[in-house]
């Protein structure tokens, strides 16, 4: 138990002990970072019977998670998911880049690994719930945006199967990250000042090109031409797997005006570039939709809602039109910049609840 006298009044509500919680077993997904570590402290203080679980994925697991569990006097398990992670996340990641698409590995990992294999493991340990440090809420059984707009992670969780949400809790969804760090420091969490993890956990910062070369046995290096919209050759590229829609830096071409990657032509192996205004589109095709607030794809047809095409995007008003198993998404009030095939697209209602999540096809 933590001495709560040293805790600021604004945080006291997170530390209320309830003896009834001792009968509720919760597995905490622990990365070794400040978010999940603070979740473990809060649930322990609230009286839950908790244990920590850390996944062994592509790299060695973070030892800080074990240290935090030792500080709390709770069990810590290491779940080896290397084979599944390689198949479901890493191979997918590489294949998407090789096909001229920009993958979203966090979405895929959350569906199959974290809220798939890890959730199953936690429930097998007689736990009633799995807790994570995501800045997200559950409202009426649906995913909903967290209070910190800069850290809201519901976008990355939009591929979780709906029937699993009843087994998941997000204890810090109504906290801002800066406030969580303050609380963590006051609680004495050893990692309260630890830096946030990098976006792609299995690729070292600045080493994406090297990673793709190594994991494709050099096939990612497939030189071709950089052309304008009229097909005029402006320069050379070393392989379109190393580029993404909207990219400006690193093209190695000179122009009076800045040029950006607009598209990839797999047949010719060309990268097509243009000006910034050429990046704006008023529609896209969404595929592989995961449903939350509707029970069938037909429930989305002719639906007016809001969409995000990247995690820190603003909400764009849109209209959905069913097209087989896919959907045409028509943006109503404004065009959207740098729509990127392979990235996620998430649909929200007026209350910030997730209606469905999918991927951008084109």
UniProtKB/Swiss-Prot annotation:
Keywords: ATP-binding, Cytoplasm, Disulfide bond, Nucleotide-binding, RNA-binding, Transferase, tRNA processing, tRNA-binding
Enzyme class: transferase
Major localization listed first in the record, in broad terms: cytoplasm
Domain of life: Bacteria
Active site: 109 (nucleophile), 201 (cysteine persulfide intermediate)
Gene Ontology biological process terms, A to Z: tRNA wobble position uridine thiolation
Chain intervals for the UniProt region annotation (Interaction with tRNA): 151-153
Sequence positions that bind ATP: 29-36, 55, 133
Signal peptide residues on this chain, from the entry's feature table: none
Gene3D superfamilies in the record: Adenine nucleotide alpha hydrolases-like domains, HUPs, Translation factors
EC number: 2.8.1.13
Function description: Catalyzes the 2-thiolation of uridine at the wobble position (U34) of tRNA, leading to the formation of s(2)U34.
Protein name stated in the entry: tRNA-specific 2-thiouridylase MnmA 1
Organism: Fusobacterium nucleatum subsp. nucleatum (strain ATCC 25586 / DSM 15643 / BCRC 10681 / CIP 101130 / JCM 8532 / KCTC 2640 / LMG 13131 / VPI 4355)
Gene (UniProt): mnmA1
């Amino acid at each position: 138990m933590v001495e709560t006298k040293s805790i600021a009044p604004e945080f006291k509500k997170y530390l209320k002990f309830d003896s009834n919680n001792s009968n509720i077993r919760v597995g905490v997904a622990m990365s070794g970072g400040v978010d999940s570590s603070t979740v473990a402290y809060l649930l322990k203080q609230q009286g839950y019977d908790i244990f920590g679980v850390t996944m062994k994925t592509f790299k060695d697991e973070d030892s800080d998670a074990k240290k935090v569990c030792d500080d709390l006097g709770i069990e810590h398990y290491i779940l080896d998911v290397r084979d599944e992670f390689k198949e479901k996340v890493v191979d997918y990641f590489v294949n998407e880049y090789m096909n001229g698409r920009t993958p979203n590995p966090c979405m895929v990992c959350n569906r199959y690994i974290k809220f798939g294999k890890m959730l199953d493991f936690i429930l097998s340990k007689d736990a009633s719930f799995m807790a994570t440090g995501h800045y997200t809420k559950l409202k009426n059984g649906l995913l909903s945006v967290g209070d910190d707009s800069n850290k809201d992670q519901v976008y990355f969780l939009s591929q979780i199967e709906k029937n699993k949400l009843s087994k998941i809790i997000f204890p810090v969804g109504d906290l801002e990250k800066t406030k969580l760090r303050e609380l963590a420091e006051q609680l004495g969490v050893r990692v309260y000042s630890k830096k946030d993890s990098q976006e792609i956990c299995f690729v070292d910062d600045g080493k994406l090109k090297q990673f793709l070369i190594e994991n494709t046995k050099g096939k990612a290096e497939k030189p071709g031409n950089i052309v304008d919209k009229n097909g005029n050759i402006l320069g050379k590229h070393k392989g379109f797997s190393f580029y993404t829609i909207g990219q400006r830096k690193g093209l190695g071409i000179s122009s009076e005006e800045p040029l950006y990657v607009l598209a990839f032509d797999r047949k010719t192996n060309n990268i097509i570039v243009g000006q910034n205004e050429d990046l704006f589109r008023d529609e896209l095709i969404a595929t592989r939709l995961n449903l939350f607030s509707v029970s069938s794809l037909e429930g989305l047809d002719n639906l007016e809602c809001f969409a995000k095409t990247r995690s820190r995007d603003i909400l764009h008003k849109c209209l959905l039109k069913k097209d087989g198993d896919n959907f045409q998404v028509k943006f109503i009030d404004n065009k959207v910049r740098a729509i990127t095939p392979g990235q996620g697209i998430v649909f929200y209602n007026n209350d910030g609840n997730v209606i469905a999540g999918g991927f951008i096809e084109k």
